[in-house]
């Protein structure tokens, strides 16, 4: 990696693709994380998970009726997230090659977000708007994230039937606000209840 470091000039970013058999070895993954932090700490735009090539390492291809999380790669993705996201890297989820199956793509996108992935690689132009819309932030999450990040927020407070704790949820809130900045927020009609920390939202998609 040191040799590659000198090829990356100022104001340029790189996106590495994790797609070879070494990524099934968590020792290798830990070593790579350390090397990236040392050599490319500020230049890494994103780490892309190459799902199809990782499946190929196992002599597999994704079935047409399965999300990536229904395959062995579904066990690998949380491990990669657990190594890289706490270190400050963002991950891109694998492509969904069965581009005509929109409902299954949307299901996979929902699971991508649950697993902490910030974006998804598109394999076909018809997927771009679907991916972008899926990563828009729900208004409830957006406003709760704002409340959590408020410097005057209480240590624990309630909102929309949930308990929020800034000390615990701050990283989540920052992730939500980052997504909102990139993808936008689903339009909402706001109605504040008697307590300002309780927000009732009716969301509607554009």
Where are these regions (language model features)?
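Expand to "…catalyze enediolate/carbanion chemistry for C-C bond making/breaking, isomerization
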Residues: 1-206
